[in-house]
Amino acid sequence: MFLTSILLSSLYLFNRILAWQGNVKHFYLFASNLLLLFIVVLYINFNTFSNSFQFNFELFNSLNPFGLSNSDISNGLLFGIDGLSLTFILLTVLLIPLTLLGNWYNINFNSNLYYTLVLAIGLVILLNFWALDYISFYILFEATLPLLFILIHIYGSSDSERASFYVLMFTLSGSLFMLLSIVVISIVLNTTNFINHNLFVLSLDLQTIIWLGLFIAIMVKTPLFPIHVWLPVVHSESPLAGSMILAGLILKLALYAILRLLLPLLCEAQILYTPMIYIISLLTIILTSLATLRQIDLKVIIAYSSISHMGIAILGVCSNTSLGIYGSIVLGVAHGFVSPALFLIVGGILYDRYHIRIVNYYKGLTTYMPQLATYIIILSFANIGTPLTGNFTGEFLSLQGGFIRNPIIGGISCISVLLAAIYQLKLTNKLTGGISSIYMHRTNDVTIREKFIMNILIISTLIIGICPQIMYNLLYWTVNNYIYII
């Protein structure tokens, strides 16, 4: 009843705000900062020594309508957090206000709807990381699709219609296999609760059926080779907020789904199919890195580099080692800081000034925009995985975990470090080095708002790289729970 009252009050307040003739983006920014403060309070009160889910609540429970978390009666949608979910929740609440700030002055058409969609997507992803049962996870997993579809379709570039349908067609088709697996789990176990699934042991044949359905959905969402072609198209046509959310948060749902859905319940099937995953991850890392070298669209270059980094994260999370699993989470979070910052540069700052994303038109940014050139160099080194950055910690541990599990695949995967340096330094040299291009002109350098966003993201990835113990304290119990011995 209490939660219902909050929901009704929020809907009424939201309706009144939309009826207001002023701009609602200030309210949404204020609300997102309040949400950040609330999650920080939860983080402070989170017990890192506990091996159980905390801050639990339940919705739509007809047998327990008051949503008491300590009740044994449960037929509703469960929500709660542990160290893993809290890590990604912190990433989410940090990126939401920064994403709102990214297009603060550039949306002239129906800006209220734009900021509403951005905040709504962020809230859905936040609840997705909070979900403790398969049904609520799937509902929220899919709820981002129509919102992202509308955002890209209305506010995207010239070919936004094709990009929006790519999002819907690819991800929805893959998620149907997840739905079938969840139905099988519900029928066999008579529960969809994450908390209880460690109590069950399934046959290998049944695990295989469920695992394949879940992995297909995760493979599309990551995305992995050969179902990765939709992401560069979507990034190239998305508005800035769409690219920042897609790279920073939505791709992390796939990594989170492996840790939350596959490893605890389907460990034997995971062992069986790990060689296949390693081959797919290796192909994803190498082929997308090589494809990056041939691209001329700035956003497509960053999109392909994101796919390559996620391939490394998948390699680590499937290594069945604490180093690999921890490294994959660190890499996922660090990528959630660096990639949105790069999209802000290429899809926000440069495109706003020069209205072109083709890399050949840019040269010698140090002449006209020296501060932006400095940010490009710093973020390029962070994206490569330079020491003291979170990307270095995540990639090093993920590759080490992969090497421990399979020395051949792990060793070959290390070529990703060289390829990342080649394509990222090539891009950086193109943008910042040499004499300024004839297509460029003197314009405003980085504004205070843009500096603030990039400084927050850079400082965040440096904190993870210099003090990885911060995340390790949160993830200790979670990571060790996912190590299995067969």
From Swiss-Prot:
Listed GO biological process terms: aerobic respiration; ATP synthesis coupled electron transport; electron transport coupled proton transport
Catalytic activity, EC: 7.1.1.2
Class of enzymatic activity (EC top level): translocase
Transmembrane regions listed in the UniProt entry: 26-46, 76-96, 113-132, 134-156, 165-185, 209-231, 239-259, 271-291, 298-318, 329-349, 372-392, 407-427, 452-472
Record carries keyword Transmembrane helix: yes
This protein's record includes keyword Mitochondrion: yes
Listed GO CC annotations: mitochondrial membrane; respiratory chain complex I
Primary residence: mitochondrion
The entry's keywords: Electron transport, Membrane, Mitochondrion, NAD, Respiratory chain, Translocase, Transmembrane, Transmembrane helix, Transport, Ubiquinone
Protein name per UniProt: NADH-ubiquinone oxidoreductase chain 4
Organism: Yarrowia lipolytica (strain CLIB 122 / E 150)
Record lineage: Eukaryota, Fungi, Dikarya, Ascomycota, Saccharomycotina
